[in-house]
């Protein structure tokens, strides 16, 4: 018999990137990258083409080109792969006029003790899934697919309750026991006002 959640797919293609208004999956990796010196806009186009097609295949439970472990690509389990750009990205590709006005360094608050090692990056991937093995495989594959253009700056892992452990739509608790995400956008109108650009 088929395992619960194994074949569940979040469509990769749509009006917006999957993984933003998607119900939270149980496991998360956020990987931040810097573009290596000498990377050109043509290099970035190639990277985005490769990442887009590989993410599309992985989220469908298919093996992407260049995969080293095809047997690990078969359980999509709500896998989403979402890409974001940092402020410096637009400088590097020579498109500063396309950088959103609000995309700037995060302000420092008086109590912050921020470390540069965990700071902003040129690109980030948010990879979420209900299966930790699929998540690990997708993370490794997408990082490897970045090739010589990228240097991994940092990675953070996160988690929520397993699917079915709480009622759908329940606001999760963080490790301090506090409800986390209570005021996140919920409705289409809120997403239109605060999220989509």
Predicted features along the sequence, with ranges:
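Long, histidine/aromatic-enriched segments associated with O2/redox biology
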Residues: 2-197
